[in-house]
Amino acid sequence: MSDSSVREKNDNFRGYRKRGRQELRKIKRSSARTEGGSTETLEDVAEDIDHRSDEDEVSDVDSGDDFDIEDEEGKKEKVYDALLTILKSEHPEPKRRRREADESNKAPAEVGEDEHENTEHGPVDDQLEIENGLLGNHEDDNDDDSSEDEKDIDSEDEQDPFESHFNQVPEKFVDELSNAFKTKSVKYKSVKGSLSDSESYIYAKPVVIGEEALVESPYRSSSIYSYFLKQRLKVQNGLLDKKTDPLTALQKKLVDPMFQYKDILYEYDSYEKDEDEYRDLYALHVLNHIYKTRDRILKNNQRLQDNPDTEHLDQGFTRPKVLIVVPTREVAYRVVDKIISKSGIDQVDKKGKFYDQFRDDSLPPKSKPKSFQHIFRGNTNDFFVVGLKFTRKAIKLYSNFYQSDIIVCSPLGIQMILENTDKKKRQDDFLSSIELMVIDQLHSIEYQNISHIFTIFDHLNKIPDQQHEADFSRIRMWYINEQAKLFRQTMVFTKYISPAANSLINGRCRNMAGRWKNHKIIGSENSSIGQSGLKIRQIFQRFDIIGNSIIEEPDYRFKFFTSVIIPGIVKSTGYEDGILIYIPDYTDFIRIRNYMKEKTTILFGDINEYSSQRQLNANRSLFQQGRLKVMLYTERLHHYRRYEIKGVKSVVFYKPPNNPEFYNEVVRFIGKNAFLGNTDLNISTVRCIYSKLDGLSLERIVGTKRAAVLSHAQKEIYEFK
C-alpha cells in the first residue's frame, strides 16, 4: 500500500477529522490572556482533564515558537461539571494519608513509631493531589519566532543520531522488524565489552531471524562532542571548548548508548554522586531532543510556506515527547531543577509554586542507615503528575498534559489517570507519542508497586482515541502504523538490577537501536558476607526447579520451605526461640503465615507493611521476651522502617534480599543480641534458601564468582563463616 493510500485511509481513522496545512496556516493566535488572580480554581484543573479542549494546542502541530494554536472558546463549563463528578465520585472524603489512596501502595511509614520518617509535605488528601498534579496553564505565548538564531537550526546531518534514528530509517526495514516482533521471529545479536576491571556491558540489537546483521559496539569516543548538541545547550553548559573534557567516568560509560537512542539499564554505585552525574547527562539528552523536535517543526513550517506542495513528516499524534517516572516529589524536584538549570532558559513560570509543593529540607533520623536517609529525605509524597512546556523564552510548569513537552510523574500518580475505574474517564492519549522514557530510582519504585510501571508500558505509544488537533499530513508513518515502540528510547536507572528491571528492558522495550546493560563484577571482599564482620554460620541451601519454570518457582520454593525448613525449626538443635523469618514478597508472606497457622503448632507472630502500630509494638515486644518463638518479617516493612528487631538468635531468609544492605542489617540483629549477652554466635545460624533464578541477588550477597558456584555446582548446601 502506498503512503498516499495509507494516509487517505487514515484521514478518518477512529473518527479523526483531517486538519490540513492550509487550514492550520489560517488560524490566528489569540491575544494574550491575563490571570484574574493567583488562586487556582477547579476550572484551572479542568484544563488538564479535558483532552478535547480547544483552549491549548496539544499536538506537535504548531506555527509559532512554541507551536501553540490556542482558542479562547474552551469547553470550560462542561469540563468543570465533569471534573466535579470525578472528584466527588472518586474522593468522597479527604484521606489522612496519601498512600491510603491505593492499599497496594500503602507504605509502612504511615503507621510507624518514628514520626519523623512519616512526615510528608503537609497533610495532603487525594483531591488536593489531583489538583496539584493536573493544573492547567492559561497563558498565551506570543514569542517571536523570527528571533530564532539561524546558527542553531539543525543541519540535518545524517550522522546526527536524532536524524538517523527518527528520520532516515527505511520504511521497509521498519515494516519487516515490526512484523517480526508480531510473529516472534526476532532474535537479539549481542556484543560484550569491558568498562573496567569490575564492570562490563552487553549491547544487544534486534534482528529478523534469517537475516545477516553486524552488531558493533556502541562506543565511539565516549565524548559529548561527538553528538550534535543545540548551540543554546553548549553555551549554557560550558561545552564550546572541545579541548576540555567535561564528562565524568560514569558519564563516559553512558554518553554513547544514550545519545545514540539505545535503551539503557544502568546499575550505579553511589546514591548521591552517581545519581547526580547520570541525571546531568540525561537532562542534557532530553533537552536536546525537545529542542531538535521543535526546531525541525519550525523549519518545516517555513518550507511549507515557501512550497505548500511538499510533504514533511515530523510529528506524532500529540505533543508530549518525554516521560520521566520517579518515586517521590523529592526526586522530581531534583530532576526538574536539573532540567531548568541546563535549559538555557531564564524565565520559569510557577517555579515558586513548584518549589513550595515539591521541595522539603527535612531529613530522616541520623540513627537510620545512610541509604535510608537518602531515599526518604525531603518530600516523600508519591502522588503527582507535572507537565513541562518549553517555549522560546520560558519554561511553563504545571502545563496541560497535551500542551507539555515533558511529563514528570510518580507511578501512582499516572496510574490514577490511566486506570480510572470509570472507563469513560480514563486518559492515555497524552502518552501516544512518547519518544524518550526515563525511569529513575527503579529500586525505590519496586517497593511502592512495580505493577504500576508495567501499566504505564501498556499505555505507551498507542493510537489515540481522540484527534487532539493532529495534522495527519505531517504525522510520521511509523506512528500511524503503530510502530512507535520501535523508535522509543527507554532508560532505566537503579541501584540494584532485579528480575523486574530485566523484565522491563527485555520484555517491554522493542527499540530497533537495541539495548545496553552494564554488569557489576562483585568481589567476595565487597559482598555482603565479606563486609558483615560477624563470625557466624551462614548456610545457603539451593532448591531445584524442574524445567526452570519461572512461573512455578514460587511453588517449588514454598514446597522446599515447608518440607525442609519448617521441620528443621521444629526439631532444631540450636535455639528454639528468637527465630526471624525474613520474607521479601508479600504474597509469599501470606502463604507462609496461613500454612503456619493451619499446619503447625509453632508459636509465632508477624509484622508486615499493613500491620497496625499496636500490632507492630505488641509482636516485637513478645518476640523480644521469647513468648513468640518465631517472627515473620517482610522486606517492604524493613525498607520503609529499618526496624531494629530485638531478641533475634537465628535468621531464615525465605529468599535472598534484592538489596544487599538488608542482608547485613538483618544478620546484625543477631550480633547486637550477642553483644547484650543474650545469644551465642557459635550456636546462632543464618540460613538462606535460593534457586538458580536468584543469581542477581546472590552476586551481591556472596560475590560474583561464588554466586556462579552456588547456582550451578552439584552441591546444594554451602556454608560461610
Curated annotation (Swiss-Prot):
Residues 55-72, 140-161 have a biased composition (Acidic residues). One of its GO terms (molecular function) is rRNA binding. InterPro entries: P-loop_NTPase, UTP25, UTP25_C, UTP25_NTPase-like. Residues 1-168 are annotated as: Disordered. It is found in: Nucleus, Nucleolus. Residues 15-31 have a biased composition (Basic residues). Pfam families: Utp25_C, UTP25_NTPase-like. One of its GO terms (biological process) is maturation of SSU-rRNA from tricistronic rRNA transcript (SSU-rRNA, 5.8S rRNA, LSU-rRNA). GO terms for cellular component: nucleolus; small-subunit processome. Keywords: Nucleus, Phosphoprotein, Ribonucleoprotein, Ribosome biogenesis, rRNA processing. The modification Phosphoserine is found at S53, S63, S196. Residues 1-14, 88-105 have a biased composition (Basic and acidic residues). DEAD-box RNA helicase-like protein required for pre-18S rRNA processing, specifically at sites A0, A1, and A2. Interacts with snoRNA U3. Interacts with MPP10, RRp9, UTP8 and UTP18. Component of the ribosomal small subunit (SSU) processome composed of at least 40 protein subunits and snoRNA U3. Belongs to the UTP25 family. This is U3 small nucleolar RNA-associated protein 25. The gene is UTP25.
